[in-house]
Amino acid sequence: MLLFAHLLQLLVSATVPTQSSPHSLRYFTTAVSRPGLGEPRFIIVGYVDDTQFVRFDSDAENPRMEPRARWIEQEGPEYWERETWKARDMGRNFRVNLRTLLGYYNQSNDESHTLQWMYGCDVGPDGRLLRGYCQEAYDGQDYISLNEDLRSWTANDIASQISKHKSEAVDEAHQQRAYLQGPCVEWLHRYLRLGNETLQRSDPPKAHVTHHPRSEDEVTLRCWALGFYPADITLTWQLNGEELTQDMELVETRPAGDGTFQKWAAVVVPLGKEQYYTCHVYHEGLPEPLTLRWEPPPSTVSNMVIIAVLVVLGAVIILGAVVAFVMKRRRHIGVKGCYAHVLGSKSFQTSDWPQKA
């Protein structure tokens, strides 16, 4: 297939950084046909671990491979020219493959169709390849994928068998294996070195539990983990030390938009039994796992007492200020009265001076 031919253009040597956990390099490519609206749109996004670092969009005013992380901006003009050329060439091949698949599935040109491809590699703490990926999907369904042995293919329907036979005829698996074991790993090490401070950090989650009434006798407890990196995290609920995996609602880890991630897990519990349930949070950024319970707010009586004390205290302060103001004003008025009385007395009248005849 023409789709895979351009992976081998990613050859480069790189310095292998010291690392303590697995890392991954992934490229996600998508082509969407738009009948009556011109050529299919083609998009590439590249990720190192959970961080997007490059993007290409054929609908941009000037389609180019663009940086999406500060650290990749260290690459020079040659890098961006080369990546842009490869992206544009890959886009042309995707459009050809879209037309080919229309024939395989006996589909018409007046419907929109989607072709997706993910490829990349994982490396372990020792810097060696853990696993390589090369997977293709058509209209949201698995189409063909390279097996974990990197030597054979899995086709998911009759149409994809055609692509499998073509790939086997030219030993496409050998080409993919060469890329995944070599250049893919080398590029990943290079990116880890360039983005070391960002990519190899561990931001611990900030966690708390919220309380949501569900019915007269049930409530939902939701355990939140916010602001963590990397994305790998485990949230569990326990009742008296036993995990509630089957009774727990768990959402997928979501990007927060600031380079960190968020996730929550929820359980429905009987009203009044909330304190028997604990949430446990596991993340590499934590020195030890977190254990949380729902903390009810202070009782209404306590709140009323506090409010009453504050009201009385405020009244005392205001009253004291008023009394002080009145006393000060009275002293001030008394001084002015004595002065006026003295000026008005006869001893200070001009008649005490010698009068003219």
UniProtKB/Swiss-Prot annotation:
Glycosylation sites: 106, 196
Domain spans labelled Ig-like C1-type: 205-293
Name this polypeptide is given: H-2 class I histocompatibility antigen, D-37 alpha chain
GO cellular component: lumenal side of endoplasmic reticulum membrane; MHC class I protein complex; phagocytic vesicle membrane
Record PTM Phosphoserine, positions in chain: 347
Keyword check for Transmembrane: yes
Similarity comment: Belongs to the MHC class I family.
